[in-house]
Amino acid sequence: VAKKCFLLSFCIAVIFCGSFPADLVAQQRLRKKIVEYGWDVTYPDFVRDNIREMEKRPFDGIIFRTKDFNHAFDVRPWKQADLQPQLDTLAQIERQKFQDNFLTLYAANNWNMDWFNDEHWNTIIENMKLFSLAVRSGHCVGVCFDPEPYGTDPWVYPGSYKDKLFEQVAEQVRRRGRQFITALQEHMPELTVLSFFQLGLFGDIVDEPDAQVRQQKLLKKWMVLLPAFYNGILEGAAPGTILIDGNESAYYYESPDEFYRAYHLIRQRAQTLVPEPLRKKYNAQVQAGMALYIDQTLAKRTTETTSQFLSPEQQLKFFEHNVYYALTTTDEYVWCYSERMNWWLPPEKVEKDRVLPAGVEEALISARQKYEQGKPLGYDIKGMIEDARLKRKGKKE
């Protein structure tokens, strides 16, 4: 009897296991991607002429920009005839490895854009439709939007709207966000928008349960109108559009815990700033991204940083650590930012202090291989970071 029961159980198990579709047990791990951006940002002609050499670097794509046509709130009409040479150049880029490229839009309000001026916004909408064509021409996955205002700030309140309630201005900004994304989707119905930061910027107010108190706290923040704009973008996003909070704050992380907390902030806590009817859409179409700031980890900045109190070997370990945990915690994209180095020009063509630091490429590759192979990082930086902080504190005392 026992033998018959065993055979019966074995047969049932075989049938049961055999009934599972192969793709339930043989799925590949989600592939994470690293894209490069920095002061070495390139233009379409450089990319076209150097794409084979560029693709030797350990990235999945780049964030680059068109000449002159790159400010979202430019109220001057863009003419396709003026942009056409760059559209042609974009179309000539023969990418192979770099399948995840983004064209950049900046948010500086250098032309006195008015959220309530329909003439301004009719122009901006047409400009963004043309920019959408540029994105498609270059076979880019989408747009990189930098909301930081390097000039006149469009996100302030009251600013020039002292005669209007905050709710009135926020609703208008939300409307413009809808129009903005709709225009960008004109030629790219399945668009990816990588923003250097979104609602994760407001992590210190999202846990306030009282909506009125939370709004009062928001009014004291930098870029107070930004949440309204992003809610408009979310509202107008087509089903195939992905919106990425790039979490620029990760520039300064010195522990794994900070990466994990940031992911939870973006994916969960930040939804306090999202209207209830949009939260299901937020969960479906907003991703958490992560950022790397090489200058910060390799002591290349002119301001004092923890990394300046680490040895060169420790600095590379610090960078590898951040690459590893950025890949671990991003939904899909990590953007790698640098200022005082150039990934694309040979050493003889850049200033001495802009040459790519020795070991940085190897550290990035090492972190990526460990992540992709499901291996642990293999070391902890807590001790060396604490020692560096003590040295830094001792210097100040």
Predicted regions and their residues:
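Bacterial N-terminal signal peptides
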Residues: 9-19
